UniProtKB/Swiss-Prot annotation:
MF (Gene Ontology): ADP binding; ATP binding; phosphoglycerate kinase activity
Family indicated by similarity: Belongs to the phosphoglycerate kinase family.
Listed name of the protein: Phosphoglycerate kinase
Subunit-level organization: Monomer.
InterPro entries the UniProt entry points to: Phosphoglycerate_kinase, Phosphoglycerate_kinase_CS, Phosphoglycerate_kinase_N, Phosphoglycerate_kinase_sf
Residues holding substrate: 21-23, 36, 59-62, 113, 146
Pathway in which this enzyme or protein is active: Carbohydrate degradation; glycolysis; pyruvate from D-glyceraldehyde 3-phosphate: step 2/5
Domain of life: Bacteria
One GO process term, biological-process aspect: gluconeogenesis
Catalytic activity: (2R)-3-phosphoglycerate + ATP = (2R)-3-phospho-glyceroyl phosphate + ADP
EC assignment: 2.7.2.3
This protein's UniProt keywords: ATP-binding, Cytoplasm, Glycolysis, Kinase, Nucleotide-binding, Transferase
Binding site for ATP: 197, 319, 345-348
Length: 391
């Protein structure tokens, strides 16, 4: 990839505009989860160290374009950054017609989604943003799959467009996992529906040595194998699709293993009583919420021998502890594996946090939709823009 990296540039005295993903949960004016902010700090600090006048922009939530709404203000993010950075940080509400930015300070632009034309990648808006800087830095992998004014258009018109350390790190890790992986390459895809992950499953089934499915997705594969799934969440209209994917895997010398034992309950609730059953013994009034110990041990063995592991989605309803043992065992197996491992997606990161394996996963992706689209083999608009500007 012919992408310019921010780390390679002389930024002394330059006006540097960094697009970060600072879309964090806020409650009563306080940031309640700072993972994305912590991920963005190294890039902001590097620009400061290089002597730049630093401007930062991001979206937060889904406000109505053209309307200021304090609920979606980046003020809580500015408050956080003020404590995290040893320099002045201020919020600029009106910046499109010019903003004063000095070397050694950070100016955070108010929510880019307050600007009319942001989501539609309006060219006039993109040009206004580009006119504010000498160097545009795209560092928000979490929004790299969206062609919007602040993630794509601005980069086409800025004097220089480059990737920040976070984005560059994401692309390097994903490239290592998908483009030239140490084999065997094992992918775990969980989640509730086959339909939302169908293109991911399709794409991965052609390149991985072993595809593992979990969650509601696995229920559809269990049904496709001819087993009763009771009242479990599954997609009857995609059973043929599941059979085809399984056949594809077998034609490549692999398979998509169906659980041999499952954990069921009669209701979906935090207090539901969990019962362990063989996969062929699920009754009509039961729901499958996790894989059983035999199945999780079999998967752990697969992971033990992997060269590369890509994890997207839990294998059970791990939010309830009685249905979390499968995901917990998978997490432990990934932590113990010598394979290069990459985890991505909101539920996956929640599981990584819950089971305390963050420092044992080789790379944790900050992208949700962007992570999935990369796995699907789709071109990410922001990355394509950076490649075009790097030539």
């Amino acid at each position: 990839m012919a992408i310019i990296n921010m780390s390679e540039l002389d930024l002394q005295g330059k006006r540097v505009l960094i697009r970060e993903d600072l879309n964090v949960p806020v409650s009563e004016g306080v940031v309640t989860s700072d993972a994305r902010l912590r991920a963005a700090l190294p890039s902001i600090k590097l620009a400061l160290e290089k002597g730049a006048a630093v401007m930062v922009m991001s979206h937060l939530g889904r406000p109505t374009e053209g309307e200021f709404n304090s609920e979606f203000s980046l003020q809580p993010v500015v408050d956080y950054l003020t404590k995290a950075l040893s320099c002045p940080v201020r919020l600029a509400k009106d910046y499109l017609d010019g903003v004063e930015a000095n070397v050694g300070e950070v100016v955070v632009f108010e929510n880019v989604r307050f600007n009319v034309g942001e989501k539609k990648n309006d060219e006039a808006l993109a040009k206004k943003l580009a006119a504010l800087c000498d160097v545009y830095v795209m560092d928000a992998f979490g929004t790299a799959h969206r062609a919007q004014a602040s993630t794509h258009g601005v980069g086409l018109h800025a004097p220089i467009a480059c990737a920040g350390p976070l984005l560059a790190g994401e692309l390097e890790a994903l490239g290592k996992a998908m483009d030239n992986p140490a084999r065997p390459l094992v992918a775990i895809v969980g989640g509730s529906k086959v339909s939302t992950k169908l293109t991911v499953l399709e794409s991965l089934s052609k390149i991985v040595d072993q595809l593992v499915v979990g969650g509601g997705i696995a229920n559809t594969f269990i049904a496709a194998a001819g087993h009763e799934v009771g009242k479990s969440l599954y997609e009857a209209d995609l059973i043929d699709e599941a059979k085809r994917l399984a056949a594809n895997a077998q034609s490549r010398g692999g398979d998509i293993p169906v659980p041999t034992d499952v954990v069921v309950a009669g209701e979906f609730s935090p207090t539901a009583a969990a019962t362990l059953k063989g996969v062929s013994q699920v009754s009509a009034d039961e729901m499958i919420f996790d894989i059983g110990p035999d199945s999780s041990e079999a998967l752990a063995e697969i992971l033990k021998n992997a060269g590369t592991i890509v994890w997207n989605g839990p294998v059970g309803v791990f939010e309830f502890d009685q249905f979390g043992e499968g995901t917990k065992r998978i997490a432990a197996a990934i932590a113990d594996s010598s394979a290069f491992s990459i985890a991505g997606g909101g539920d996956t990161l929640a599981a990584v946090d819950k089971y305390g394996i963050a420092d044992k996963v080789s790379y944790i992706s900050t992208g949700g939709g962007a992570f999935l689209e990369f796995l699907e083999g789709k071109e990410l608009p922001a990355v394509a823009m950076l490649e075009s500007r790097g030539k």
